[in-house]
């Protein structure tokens, strides 16, 4: 599967999309936001590598992305997710084709959080599940056509189980994604919420869109949808 025409087309489409996303978003970000992106990249890569080595049927490789999205908005989340996969791809080429999906994760997470995902537990749960379903649908073609459904150890085992039950490759990968991704994104949102609550209010105020100029008249917690 890895060298097939389908794989090459899928790879080119997603990598090309990632390049366009970076070109459109990075120049628009303020310096204070760009300064925290490297920290988010390290979080994504380190946590993702550890979880992948353990063999859990999750990823947890978007914690940094969602945290930036919570602090600085959807566009910053999009740039962080995309750049994370590009940088990670230098160490682990398997991450590169997922760059556009990672960018979409950051962008969608930013909008879910802005809409109030962090305000109550039930909103967090619903947002995490919806985010996971959307991201799972986006990632399934990459995992299926580029990697044959074996992009991860733990997730690959679930794909193999569905294959043994007689399902097609794309069907097996999609079902695996609809199991793993909602749980993964729910966990990621919960971790990001805990991190946001632990940060000083001055940090929240300085990183939110508009920065210090909009500090007056709005509580810092509202910048990330926290009550």
Question: Can you annotate each of these PLM segments?
Answer:
Residues 1-67:
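Hydrophobic transmembrane alpha-helices
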Residues 1-15, 53-55, 95-97, 117-227:
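Membrane-embedded alpha-helical hairpins and interfacial helices in multi-pass inner-membrane proteins
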Residues 19-28, 111-116, 195-203:
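Structural signal for the C-terminal ends of transmembrane alpha-helices
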Residues 21-23, 61-77, 108-112:
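Generic transmembrane alpha-helix motif of multi-pass integral membrane proteins
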Residues 25-33, 68-80, 117-119:
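Membrane-helix interface "capping/anchor" motifs
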Residues 34-39, 63, 78-82, 96-103, ...:
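Hydrophobic alpha-helical transmembrane segments
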Residues 45-60, 81-122:
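Interfacial aromatic-anchored transmembrane helix boundaries in multi-pass membrane proteins
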């Amino acid at each position: 599967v890895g060298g097939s025409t389908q794989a090459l087309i899928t790879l080119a489409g997603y990598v090309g999309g990632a390049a366009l996303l970076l070109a459109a978003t990075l120049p628009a970000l303020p310096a204070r936001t760009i300064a925290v992106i490297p920290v988010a990249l390290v979080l994504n890569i380190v946590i993702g590598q550890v979880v992948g080595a353990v063999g859990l049927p999750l990823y947890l490789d978007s914690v940094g992305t969602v945290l930036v999205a919570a602090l600085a908005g959807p566009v910053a989340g999009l740039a962080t997710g995309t750049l994370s996969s590009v940088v990670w791809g230098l160490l682990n080429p398997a991450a590169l084709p997922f760059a556009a999906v990672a960018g979409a994760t950051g962008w969608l997470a930013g909008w879910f959080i802005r809409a109030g995902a962090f305000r109550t537990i039930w909103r967090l749960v619903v947002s995490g599940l919806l985010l996971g379903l959307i991201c799972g649908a986006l990632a399934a073609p990459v995992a299926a056509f580029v990697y044959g459904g074996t992009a991860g150890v733990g997730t690959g085992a679930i794909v193999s189980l569905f294959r043994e039950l007689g399902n097609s490759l794309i069907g097996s990968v999609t079902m695996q994604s609809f199991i793993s991704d909602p749980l993964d994104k729910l966990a990621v949102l919960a971790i990001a919420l805990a991190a946001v609550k632990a940060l000083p209010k001055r940090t929240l105020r300085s990183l939110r869109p508009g920065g210090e100029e909009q500090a007056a008249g709005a509580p810092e917690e509202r910048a990330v949808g926290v009550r």
